[in-house]
Amino acid sequence: MVDERIIKFIKRHHTLNLATVSAEGLPYCAACFYAYDNKRNRLIFTSDEATRHAQEMAKNPNVACAITLETRIVGKVQGVQICGKAERGDEEDKRQYIKRFPYAAVAPLTIWAIEPSFIKLTDNTLGFGKKLIWESKK
């Protein structure tokens, strides 16, 4: 079970920075709006199949992403780093995404979902450099 503090942080935000890697081993990142399904522990986002990151995910599903609170106050620094596998989303993922972003209902969507294997929350509000780590048992 993912720590409630991690879930709360993920649900409070809406943009993740996704990292993929090309067949040649070159990294790439893209910012994506996301919804989080805490029942299934999935980060859900859209990406056109023509984008570089979608093409890279189709060939190599291993991804990482970061969600951060932008602040200059050291005592308020918070962010998650996530590793996992990306896959094409299902109907439930689409419902969750549209629930979070209703305007997306009228757009042609290619839904993706990340199933995390590792999540690390750094939260300085709990103490300087305090980290909470969750790892999948799979």
What are these language model-derived features?
Residues S47-T51, A64-L69, E92-A104:
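Short acidic (Asp/Glu) patches
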